[in-house]
Amino acid sequence: MGALPDARGSGAARALLDDFVVRAGAQGLPEVELECFAQNARALKFYQGRGFAAVRELRGWNQPADASRRASAREPAPEPRVVDRDAAFEWLADVERRIADLPLQVTPSSLAAAVRPLTCWRLGSAQIVFSVVDGTPTQVHSLVDTDPAQRDAQVLLRRLRAVHAADEIVIPALQRDDLGGDAARREGFAPQVLHQVLMVRALEKP
């Protein structure tokens, strides 16, 4: 959500957010969530004032193209299993049922609307969903490893670097450290300057 400079202080943002919360409650949803850049103190204060609490940090990661070329010289990583879109979404939906606070954008509800063509790999306890479009960075849409050690996620990232060695690889600021972010750090990805927090507000039952 954003507000034009002229609308600041008018109460429009507060009214929109409150309407969103009321509509969600009327549909029987237990909570609502949003993401906010951690460095945006004004927005954080606004959301906290409307009952939202930060529950998770969400980081973004980059791997420049030149670093990817160097990575391609490493020993080849194990071959992941390519899974079709339906199977990948079913796996993610199961994870979403078992693990709380998974950002909406990395789940099937949002991925189903992706315009870029999605490729899905799975290895052990981890799955990665990414897209490759000529002339643009390789984009990771979802990376989840249900094993705290995140070894399989690290192997998937290493394999992605090797296969798309000439491309920049971008993981948007939606990545939880405990579900794949630590693997990105170990694999040499650089953290983006700005990161987000996942904020949640519980709703009262009607």
Which role fits each region the language model picked out?
Residues 49-136:
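Amide-forming acyltransferase catalytic core, primarily the GNAT-like/NAT-type
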Residues 62, 193, 197-203:
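Catalytic cores of nucleotide-enabled group-transfer and carboxylate-activating enzymes in metabolic
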